[in-house]
A protein has these predicted regions:
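Amphipathic alpha-helical
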Residues: 276-278, 282
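Small-residue-centered hinge/linker elements
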Residues: 2-247, 252-255, 284-389, 393, ...
Length: 484
C-alpha cells in the first residue's frame, strides 16, 4: 500500500511538472508572438512604438543587481529581457555584446544612461565600468549619465561618462565603503543557544556575530584596512575619470557624504542639475538626433518606417485618463502593488502630451503621498503637459502630501466632500535600536569614516548635529513644496 501511495504521488508530481512546462512554453510563445507583432502597445496607455529613422541617441535605464556569471532565469526572464534596458539582473558579458552592437550602428550617436539603485560588489561594477570605457575608446561615442539619488556605486559608474546630470532637489550620497553588522551574542545565550567556534587564523571572523556583541580587535583592524584599500581605489579611479577633482576634493566629498545636487555642481562632482526632459532636449539639440529607449530600438530596428497610429482612431478626438494611485516611491519597479513610481506614470504623461488626438487630460489621484523627490519628478512632467493641454485633477479618497503636490500643476482640481487632502509639509523619522542590547542582547556595529556615519548606525541615537542637518534638508524640501 505504501509503495502504491508513493507511486501515485510520483505520478501526480510528474503530471504537474509536464503541465507547468507546457503552460510556460505556450505562454512564452504567446508573449514572443505579441512582441513580434507589427505594433507594440504599453499595457496601460497603449503607447505604440514607431520606427525611428536617422540619427539617434539610445536611452538606457539601469537598476538592479550586477552579476559576473549568468544566473538561473525562468523562461519569462529570457522572453521579456530587453538586453541592455535592465531593471533586474545585469550579466556583464551580455551587456558587452549588446554595447558592441550599438557601437557598430552608425545611426547611434551616443548613449544616455538613466541610473537607479545598483546592487553588487565593486569588483563587478568596476568590470562594467571598464566595458563602458572600452565602448567610448572603440567607438568615440559619448556616454551621458542622469540619476535622481546618486550613491557611491552609481557615481563611480557614472564617472566614466562625458557628463553627469542629476535631478533637482536630490542628494548625492557618497558614503564610501563601510562595514555594517548586527551581533546576536547575548540574544542567543538568552534563548539558550550556545555556540562554539573553532577556527584557525586570527582574521577568521565569519561567526563573530553569533558569539560576540561587538567585533574583535582583529576584525576592526581588518575593516580599517578594507575601507582604506577600497577608498583608495575609488579615489584613484575617480581622479583619472574626473580630472577636475583633486584628491582633497574627493576626500572631502566622502567625509561630507550627503551632498545636495546644487552643491554637487559647485564642487564639480557633477556637470549639471536638470530634469530628464531638459537633459533629453539638451543632447538631442547638440547631436541633432532623437532619443530612443533601448527597448524600442530593439523592437523596431529591423522594421520599415511606419507612421505611429494613435490609440484613438485617426479622426477621433478624446480625453486621456491617467491614474495616479498608491504610495509614491522612488522605485523603478512597475510591478509593485499599491505604489506609484515616476517612471511608469511619466510614460503615460508623455503619451497624453504627444498624441495629437488627445485634447485634454483627466488625472485621478488617490495617493497618500510618499517620496518628495519622486513627487517632484511627476510634478515637473505634469507642469509641461499643462502648458500644452488642459489638465484636470479628480481626487479620490485621499490626495495628501505628495498626492497634493502632483495635483498642483492642474488647471482645475476637483475633490469629493469626503476626500482627505492637504497635508502640506515634510515629515521624516529617525529610529534607533540602542535598547535592543539591554532587552534582547542584539548589538549593532557600523565602521566608517563618514561624518554622517551615526545616521546609518541603528545602534546609536542621532547626534544633535545630524538632527540639525536633517531639519535643514526637511525645511528646504518644504520650501520647494510650497513654492510650487
Amino acid at each position: 500500500m505504501a509503495f502504491l501511495f508513493k507511486k501515485i504521488i510520483r505520478l501526480i508530481k510528474t503530471y504537474f511538472i509536464i503541465v507547468g512546462f507546457l503552460t510556460t512554453l505556450f505562454l512564452s510563445l504567446g508573449i514572443f508572438l505579441l512582441l513580434s507583432s507589427e505594433h507594440y502597445f504599453d499595457s496601460k496607455s497603449f503607447i505604440t512604438v514607431p520606427h525611428l529613422k536617422g540619427d539617434k541617441l539610445i536611452h538606457l535605464r539601469w537598476s538592479g543587481t550586477l552579476h559576473d556569471s549568468q544566473t538561473e532565469s525562468s523562461p519569462f526572464d529570457i522572453v521579456l529581457s530587453n538586453g541592455l534596458d535592465l531593471e533586474g539582473d545585469f550579466y556583464i558579458p551580455h551587456m558587452e555584446t549588446y554595447l558592441k552592437e550599438l557601437g557598430d550602428d552608425h545611426e547611434v550617436k551616443g548613449l544616455v544612461i538613466e541610473l537607479g539603485h545598483l546592487e553588487g560588489g565593486l569588483a563587478v561594477l568596476s568590470e562594467l565600468r571598464d566595458v563602458l570605457k572600452n565602448f567610448k575608446k572603440r567607438t568615440q561615442k559619448p556616454i551621458y549619465f542622469w540619476f535622481t539619488h546618486g550613491d557611491t556605486k552609481s557615481y563611480y559608474l557614472a564617472s566614466v561618462g562625458d557628463e553627469i546630470l542629476m535631478a533637482p532637489g536630490h542628494k548625492l550620497l557618497l558614503l564610501g565603503p563601510m562595514v555594517n553588522s548586527i551581533y546576536f551574542g547575548d540574544a542567543l545565550k538568552r534563548l539558550g543557544v550556545n555556540i562554539e567556534v573553532l577556527k584557525t587564523g586570527t582574521y577568521k571572523s565569519a561567526f563573530e556575530p553569533f558569539v560576540s556583541n561587538e567585533p574583535s580587535e582583529a576584525s576592526i583592524f581588518m575593516y580599517d584596512e578594507f575601507i582604506k584599500s577600497v577608498k583608495e581605489n575609488l579615489i584613484q579611479d575617480l581622479s583619472q575619470s574626473l580630472p577636475q577633482l583633486t584628491r582633497d576634493a574627493l576626500e572631502k566629498a566622502f567625509k561630507t557624504s550627503i551632498i545636495e545636487s546644487e552643491e554637487a555642481v559647485k564642487a564639480h562632482l557633477i556637470t549639471q542639475v536638470s530634469y530628464f526632459h531638459e537633459a533629453k532636449s539638451k543632447y538631442e539639440t547638440f547631436h541633432k538626433a532623437k532619443l530612443q529607449r533601448y527597448s524600442d530600438y530593439v523592437l523596431t530596428k529591423s522594421r520599415k518606417q511606419k507612421e505611429s497610429p494613435s490609440y484613438l482612431e485617426e479622426d477621433e478626438k478624446g480625453i486621456a485618463l491617467i491614474e495616479a494611485i498608491g504610495t509614491i516611491t522612488d522605485s523603478f519597479d512597475d510591478s509593485m502593488d499599491q505604489s506609484l513610481n515616476p517612471h511608469s506614470i511619466i510614460k503615460e504623461i508623455h503619451w497624453a502630451k504627444e498624441d495629437k488626438n488627445v485634447k485634454a487630460v483627466v488625472m485621478r489621484v488617490n495617493s497618500p503621498g510618499g517620496s518628495a523627490t519622486a513627487s517632484d519628478l511627476i510634478w515637473e512632467e505634469l507642469r509641461l503637459l499643462a502648458l500644452e493641454k488642459p489638465l484636470v485633477v479628480s481626487m479620490g479618497d485621499v490626495a495628501a502630501s505628495g498626492g497634493y503636490y502632483i495635483s498642483a500643476p492642474a488647471h482645475k482640481i476637483f475633490a469629493n466632500a469626503n476626500t482627505i487632502t492637504g497635508s502640506i509639509g515634510v515629515i521624516s523619522m529617525i529610529a534607533n535600536f540602542k535598547n535592543f542590547k539591554e532587552k534582547y542582547g542584539i548589538s549593532f556595529f557600523l565602521h566608517s569614516d563618514s561624518d554622517r556615519k551615526d545616521l546609518f548606525d541603528m545602534g546609536k541615537e542621532a547626534s544633535e548635529a545630524d538632527k540639525e542637518f536633517l531639519k535643514m534638508q526637511s525645511d528646504k524640501t518644504y520650501h520647494d513644496f510650497i513654492s510650487k
